[in-house]
Regions:
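ABC family nucleotide-binding domain
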Residues: 4-225
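C-terminal boundary and immediately downstream tail of ABC-type ATPase nucleotide-binding domains
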Residues: 213-216, 222, 226-245
Length: 245
């Protein structure tokens, strides 16, 4: 195990009865990496991502996050989750709260920030994504692209060390998806550690430091975007890329 790994995954297995959604997955994520995970439906990509903060509890294996074994039942997972932002396909904003309250709730409750401090940080982040004028709107008054940009900056309000993205643009049309990808590219350039399950190959080529291809619960191939897309090593990966590019 590298000493500079932010997350180390060892022999991760997730079974649902006879089905192995994850089949002995091992990898390391270093600070500042932008790791894009691709693969066909049912390959285990989202299960892997959701296992990293124990939204899916692995059947066996180990996840070390910032030196702590978070698969140990004695560990306070909520403490570690505060350092792992998560952005979902369906935004998961609280519908009954304004955008500003969506963004300040967790920092005030969990990080014990004052209302003024939490609101100042939220407004600064809203400005970064061009949505400061929507602070007092409710989620139902926003477009899908706006909601997802809010979901990203809401995650940033908690000052996480890594953000996990589970198909963040798959519920959006290409134009709205483009708005979200622009925010993610800027975030990648800022040095944020990001792990992203996506079908957006253009984003993977442009912003990823590493691309991982998963199939049947295993990591089949991983490489830099340049090597991965121009010179895939396995037939399975070649066939997948040929079918989508």
């Amino acid at each position: 195990m590298s000493t500079d790994a932010l997350i180390t995954v060892k022999d991760l297995v997730k079974s649902y009865g006879q089905l192995h959604a994850l089949n002995g997955v091992s990898t390391e994520i270093k600070k500042g990496e932008v790791v894009v995970i691709i693969g066909p439906s049912g390959s285990g990509k989202s299960t892997f991502l959701r296992s990293l903060n124990l939204l899916e509890v692995p059947s066996s294996g180990q996840i070390i996050f910032e030196g702590a074994d978070i698969t140990d039942p004695k560990v306070d997972i909520n403490k570690h989750r505060q350092k792992m932002g998560m952005v979902f396909q369906q935004f998961n904003l609280f519908p009954h709260l304004t955008i500003l309250k969506n963004m300040t709730l967790a920092p005030m409750k969990l990080l014990k920030k004052s209302k003024a401090e939490a609101e100042a940080k939220a407004m600064e982040l809203l400005k970064r994504v061009g949505l400061e004028d929507r602070a007092n709107a409710y989620p139902s008054q926003l477009s899908g692209g706006q909601k997802q940009r809010i979901a990203i900056v809401r995650a940033l309000c908690m000052e996480p060390d890594v953000i996990l993205f589970d198909e963040p643009t798959s519920a959006l049309d290409p134009e709205m998806g483009g708005e979200v990808l622009d925010v993610m590219k800027a975030l990648a350039k800022s040095g944020m550690t990001m792990i992203i399950v996506t079908h957006e190959m253009g984003f993977a080529k442009e912003a990823a430091t590493r691309v991982i291809f998963m199939d049947q619960g295993k990591m089949i191939e991983e490489n830099t975007p340049q090597e991965f897309f121009t010179n895939p090593k396995t037939d399975r990966c070649k066939n997948f890329l040929n079918s989508i590019l």
